[in-house]
Structure formats: C-alpha cells, structure tokens
Amino acid sequence: MTDVAQGLLDTSVIIDHDIVDADRLPAQAGISAVTLAELSAGPHTTADPAERSRRQDRLQWAAATFEPYPLDADAARAYGRVVAAVRASGRRERSRVADLLVAATAVANDLPLFTRNPDDLAHLGDVVEVHAV
C-alpha cells in the first residue's frame, strides 16, 4: 500500500481496478457519489451486450464495496475552487464536469485523489493532492 492512509479513487481507478497496482492505492479508499453516478450510466451507453454486462458487474462491485462520499454543500463550494484552478491554468471546465466534481468531493473531505488520468488533473495541484496510479 502507498504511504497515504486514506484517499478518494476517481472513476478511472474503479473502471481499471483489476489492472491497478493495489500497492499504489490507499489503505482506506473511498469513491464519490459522482463516480457511482458515472458507473450507473455506463451500462446504458454501450450497445455491446458483453460490455454492458462488464459495466454492470463493475457498478455492482463498486456499490457493494464502497460507501460513496456525497456531493454535498461542502463539495459544491469546493467545486468553485476547482473550477477557478482549471480556468487559471487556461483550460476549460465544461466538458469535464464529472471529473471536477469528483475532485471537489476530495477537496471537501480533505482527501488526496487517486487517478489513472493524472495529466487531466495536474493543474489542480494547489487545490487537491493528486496521485497517479
């Protein structure tokens, strides 16, 4: 396990959980309700029955494994800070709302964020601690 005791796993880590090195994850890991929402949408966004089944299995596993951190008022306020960091870096936030809401959930709960897409979140270094896995 990583030296970090607690952390929030973003959706990419949950999707790729089977291939992620467990030693790079925190001992106590959580997910955001936003991740659960993204996973819930997943089975409905593919026409391939085998892929739909895999996505449904991943959703059920995540729902049974994690108690999601809510997207509450603290996370909503933290989202403003996250968007400010995105804009300060010259990037646009519109197409990445779900990722940024997950990051805001990490900020609101004072947790580092673990992701498979660190380049997408590199500009948030002053707002949230990002760990690549």
Predicted feature descriptions by range:
Residues 2-8, 17-104, 122-132:
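PIN-domain endoribonuclease scaffold, especially VapC-family toxins
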Residues 108-120:
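C-terminal structural segments of small proteins and small subunits
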Residues 117, 132-133:
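Short beta->alpha connector loops at strand-helix junctions that form conserved
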